[in-house]
Amino acid sequence: MEYQNNIFDDIRPYYDSEISSAMSRIAESPYFPKLASFVFPGSSVDEIREMILAIDNIYDFQFKVMHQANLRIIEESVTDFTYSGLDRIDPEKQYLYVSNHRDIMLDASLLQSVLVNHNYKTTEITFGANLMKGQLVIDVGKSNKMFKVERPGGSIKEFYKASKHLSDYIRMTLRDKKESIWIAQRNGRTKDGIDRTDQGIINMFRMSYDGDKVQSISELNIVPIAVSYEWEPCDLLKVLELYVSNHHTGTYVKKEGEDLNSILTGIIQPKGKVHFAICKPICIDELMPFSELPSNEFNRKVAGLIDQRICSEYVLTPNNYIAYDMLKGNEQYSSEYTPEEKLAFSRHLSSLNAYSETCDVEELKEILLGIYANPIESKNHFTQN
């Protein structure tokens, strides 16, 4: 559906009427042959180019191209792809899927495959403005129902304006366009394995609604998503980033091309078992006890509801238990893994020895163990309280 009101043209995905032009640009990109060969290894580049040029709507692009790309990623890098909770959502309703965030692209992209496999509509997807660079990325992203989200920066006034604009777009999309949305629970990926919802995200959701704060959240139909990877995407890159942050004051500054490197690494790196848990929607009855709370406390409580869902339904793997035992120096969870699995994880841990000339390897290893062990701490916290 296309809207005459153009106030969201700066962030919205493409309309169907813009797809043909986008496909022409994609087909002529110098990166096209390599992408086509990966997604469609059994076809020639010319055949795929002809197919791309015939696409003139979002649905066909998502089903014929992006769904096939997801299937290839699963085939090449995932040993077991599972999901749960589809019975908790109604295909006729729109939801705001709030997900933990472990991989720049795959957290949202692989969820679309789950939905497509069961004839659910795909979602619109938030995509950081820092990533929406280069014509190919813009065309693929906006043809795939991605919309741009500005990262924090600039003046407080500018950030407020951008947050209000995003909030208005999210509510309009759910209410008027009748489209679901995927958004991460926080700004940027979780680097330390601790999945927590940013209270600022909850505040942003509310900015587009002037009335009752309970109603402002309940009508969004929030559905938490817990995605877990046996092998954490870009885990070594995350370790190095955390290490640098620990040893330098101020905020970590990414190098040119670092986000693209993380995207590509996340796609091709072996991921082992991957599970998506679609959690129970947040309902108004759960929100009502918070109705009289001050605004900041209300936001904290709503974020806590989302965290409880995500951490409780996060599926743990042997790597989590191995890392926890190694970090604690005991064998509390030894029944959850085999000697072979522990050996494989230990070999992966040893790969950090390559950085011995520039870093404290023992600290690097402790950071990596924390990334894998922290989901156990989180699950224990929320299931015992």
Predicted features along the sequence, with ranges:
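Glutamate identity and glutamate-enriched acidic tracts
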Residues: 2, 18, 28, 47, ...
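General structural signal for secondary-structure boundaries
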Residues: 16-17, 58, 152, 199-212, ...
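Long, C-terminal catalytic modules of enzymes
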Residues: 230-238, 242-257, 261-346
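Charge-dense, low-complexity intrinsically disordered segments
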Residues: 56, 60, 153, 157-160, ...
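Membrane-anchoring hydrophobic helices of lipid-metabolizing enzymes
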Residues: 1-95, 101-112, 116, 138, ...
